[in-house]
Amino acid sequence: AVAASELPDTINADYQLGGAYVPPAGVTIVVRDSTAKPAPGLFNICYINGFQTQPGSDWPKALLLLDTKGNPIADPNWPDEYFLDVSTDANRKAILAKLVPVIKGCAAKGFKAAEFDNLDSYTRTDGRLSAAHAVAFAKMLAAATNAAGLAAGQKNAPDLARRVKAEIGFSFVVSEECHRWDECRAYTDVYGKQVINIEYSDDLRGTFEKVCADPQPPKSTILRDRLLVPKGKAGY
């Protein structure tokens, strides 16, 4: 299959990682977890945790980043996720081998693209991992994704946007809170309109109306609750 090269012209996205629900009218793109089914008739992006473990998943200790005592290191922001050790080529190949079935599974279900979370996790490892390690593994992920017939997307890491777009050829980017942290231009200068941005209701810079009136964030910016509760549940 030939991978889609970019997102549809009309980017009205919905970000459904906390659980799938019928997208609102007018939505053209849906992001769902790799364990979910795509939304019928729309452009679906498959969420894959590319650089950390998913809560409850089973990974060999040899592929996890360890501290000096030999214990896996958890992400300080998400203590039930552990860093994957992408510091060596052998590890990168072994980690990729575990993720390729997930990528192929997304393609088989009918997803059109995949986004790989935690490209920026190296910034939270106290120097144990580097940007070079992250980029090297991202390149492998993107190649495997394109080989499966899916477009590959960058997730966050504005500092790497120009580099990974040039070196890897990511088709699009999914950013979180680029308006809140004044990072949107880092993405739009590189990816143009191929940007989906999510702002969270508990930490906006002004009202959402002000966010939308600001020319900096992409037109595809959407507002979500922090826990990404499915529509119809309390907190959505």
Locate predicted features.
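Glycan-processing catalytic domains of CAZymes
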Residues: 1-236
